[in-house]
Amino acid sequence: MKNDTTVVIGAGPYGLSVAAHLRAAGLSALTFGKPMEFWRSMPPKLYLKSSWSALSISDPAGKYSLNRYSKQFGVPWQEPVPLQVFLDYGKWFQEQAVPEIDETYVASLSQDGDGFHLDLDDGRSVRAKKVVVATGIAAYANIPDNLGHLPPTLLSHSQDHKDYSNFQEKRVVVLGSGQSALEAAALLHEAGAAVELIARGPVVWIDRRLYYKTGPIKRIFYPPSDVGPPGVNWLVANPLLFRRFSDKMRISLDARAVRPAGATWLRPRVEGQIPTTPNTVITRAVERGQHAYLELSDGTTRDVDHIVLGTGYRADIHVLKFIDPALLGKVQERAGSPLLNEWFESSVPHLYFVGAPAGYVFGPLCRFVVGAKFPARQIARRFRML
């Protein structure tokens, strides 16, 4: 009997988008994962950096956009968008567009003849012909090499915290200058911690005046994807075009499109509130009892209770422990990013990657919710051909 089962691993914006497009096309798929789990682990008072127009999870007809949700439930347009609004919207999208989700985790994925074998956490197993890996960014937390030896009592990543109240009256260094670092610093300060922000570069704030003041003609400067500064944003808005650029140009555009920077609305909660040491790195970190002793590149030292990393994420499929090493070894990659064809298919037939791992080939759009539409559409189109 022919096995034609499709499995989507992950139920965040990318997994939900792929599953929604497949379902709308009449193509059945098993979707595994807890809906919006990564987003639900964030501090409840968080606001999102992306604009309202860039936060719709994708279904092919646009029936379940954020605007549709807003109109149906009387949720007013607002920027910045509160995390809770996005969580409520994501729950509604899943219930409408992908109602049948199995919240069991995939424990292992291996190759099985011309298909794949999946073992689930609850002891069940599934055989699939096609697999889409859409596991989000949580596994890719970027830990600097010279800090990774510190224990969890002294070192954590911003994604590890939903509540910072346990840091009240603690001395905490936040490392980084992007949105996650700046917001972590603000939340720590507001929770009563003695916070210092240390960044290898300057602290930069995103200037959105052109976006808000140009009215309808803003679309000349800003594509709907809204990723990157004017000029660069149009070059990264089309993933198929981005894929055609040379490696050197893709790397350059990616760096220019997504630089460490904070949303302007966060600025009053940081500037003048939190001591900041820019253009500085931690050169050495030593565990001393219950403290971390830090040596900085400017010659100064710190003795702190904890370090929170706001150092973002670095996609590397080798950290996906559920993928069998033998299968992973067959995936052609560049610095941990799979090399994908136009359908997001890896060098292993019928194994697809979406989201952050696809960024090397398709660009920085893959790191944002707005980027989910393109791979979902491509994969559904491809599966209809097979």
Region spans (language model):
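Flavin (FAD/FMN) cofactor-binding and adjacent substrate-gating region
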Residues: 40-72, 224-243
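Flavin (primarily FAD) cofactor-binding/catalytic cores of flavoenzymes
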Residues: 1-36, 40, 78-179, 183-386
